[in-house]
């Protein structure tokens, strides 16, 4: 119904309000159901403190407070109408709806599905707690500005059994989904269904709902009265799962009517697709209910072309629409009579089949939506102008209500204070929060931290219209806090203390650091921020520890599967630093679908990193021997490698290649720029004692960005021998300086450099040695690939591209 209203709303704006006390999985499902119809801006989540289920008396204070918190959220959305599709809920869970007793600046319209508990108090309201809950809800229900009933029968019940006047009650009918339809199944599919559910070629279908008003005993009794040849030809199939006690009771009942157990077939659990198939395949569908608000099963069956028989009381005549197809559900002889006629009178049976399609076509969600929208329009036309000041008054009065609830603990009150703040949507400026949880604690000056530093710098400098840009960090055992002390130390201006972050609707967390060590603990924080309406987005630099675990330390090998699975299941967006990484991430999630259950809202995209050292908050300073080193570079062809030394980076292979070249008498220099990393102890020891060290081999650690620029400018070419990268910043930095590049032929380098680099393959030293010689030959002829033709971005452009991958809402769109 709600989707149809949105689809047919025309000039009217529709928003949805989601209960933030529900699990993040439920919230995901709701947002997923509407994402093709509504923008994120029109999906609101209200915060409150759970549990609120009325069945536990200890929850009653929180329940009242949750209703007040919801009112504050609604007041900040400022709708004309609040449409409550299901009102009598919340006894067994934290479902929260209410109709204010005071004057509020919106109209409340409730859907009435039925008043069955009210009309059958002995059966349904025997429990004092549930009776109190239901009657309290009924009193609220009567305060609604309008009631939309799903049938004329339900509307009449409202008029007769409540104090709601008839001019406030409207029948909007109901419908079923488009999935319920006549389907021409293949013979193979039909046979598989028969095998799965032990179905005969022809059968009578009814629903095995073990609930008194569903009257399951009556069709079984009537079936037992059919002629033996009809019973033999048409076994009775009872759809849906029945608990063992109920099953045994039905079987004993059938035996008391003279039926054998084999004449009844129980399907057990049915998927929607299989139920639709059974509707299509059955000879006859029988629905003997004693009381319905509408009666979806007969409509479902008729939409599938089934010859349908049903009760002639409450709402079912409206649905079935033909007196001859109905029976008195209290009279088994009447049920038998109509069933037998349908099974023996071919003309009547053909009429039943034809009527099913004609009658079911009268019901659609579009029709229901139009009736509802017309009802909304009439309600608003009869309403007086709303005083804008009433919105603020609602917030004030609801806070006062919360303050007077004695049953709330101090923890409850603190949670409600946060909830009230989150629900004040109007008061918020949206926030773009850059997660620098690693950088804020220690800047190790790795490539990833250079990315974090550069992106943060650009976002702070350029700003994002409609958003406050801040840096945040997470400390295990605490909450997210603003990284104001870090900003004060590294950027102009004063930023204050590291206060806790209040995440609210449309805020965006973008984690540019690699924070695998924080998972899975930080997941609770991520779920909480998303349950407040914020978005959790993460930059993924690579997943090499998952693809090539031998390249990583054991701790990283353990952390990465946890990290990426948590991101897949709990993040909104994964923004990878290259298309290659994005494809790898999507492939890994698919490969591990047996245990990784991704958030249905998750998107995986990519952007490219920047490379202008001047804009990355570069470090400065020149070593004492800088001029001597630069002179050495100029004296002979010099090749440079840049990056932390790790097994995958190819330093050992490159060194061995140059050793071969030196043995051949080649006068080439190799400059290795990068500190010692993991599992390269023997290589580093070899470097420290190498006979060519500081002659033709140079190892420079912890140099400044300023000196690196000078080295780039004087090198003949960059050698990037890495066997795996997420992006490869040195490649872009070299291209920016027009430094030619000799690189390994791997997908991500092909994506970035395309034909503008000299590629090599293989893991033997001779492979790199040959690549260097071949490249030099081209270089001497001025025919080598030109790295300046590689497309690269400034950090400003990279940050802008990152923003395009975030759920940014333009300022003009904010109401």
From Swiss-Prot:
Primary subcellular site in the record, as a coarse category: membrane
UniProt function note: Mannosyltransferase involved in the biosynthesis of the repeat unit of the lipopolysaccharide (LPS) O-antigen region.
Top-level EC class: transferase
Any one GO MF annotation of this record: glycosyltransferase activity
Keywords assigned: Cell inner membrane, Cell membrane, Glycosyltransferase, Membrane, Transferase
EC number assigned by the record: 2.4.1.-
Protein name from the UniProt record: Serotype-specific mannosyltransferase WbdA
Pathway info: Bacterial outer membrane biogenesis; LPS O-antigen biosynthesis
Record's bilayer topology term: Peripheral membrane protein
Source species, domain of life: Bacteria
Family named by the database record: Belongs to the glycosyltransferase group 1 family. Glycosyltransferase 4 subfamily.
Region Alpha-(1->2)-mannosyltransferase: start-end pairs: 1-374
Alphabetical GO biological process terms: O antigen biosynthetic process
Chain residue ranges for the region called Alpha-(1->3)-mannosyltransferase: 431-804
PANTHER family xref list: GLYCOSYLTRANSFERASE WBBK-RELATED
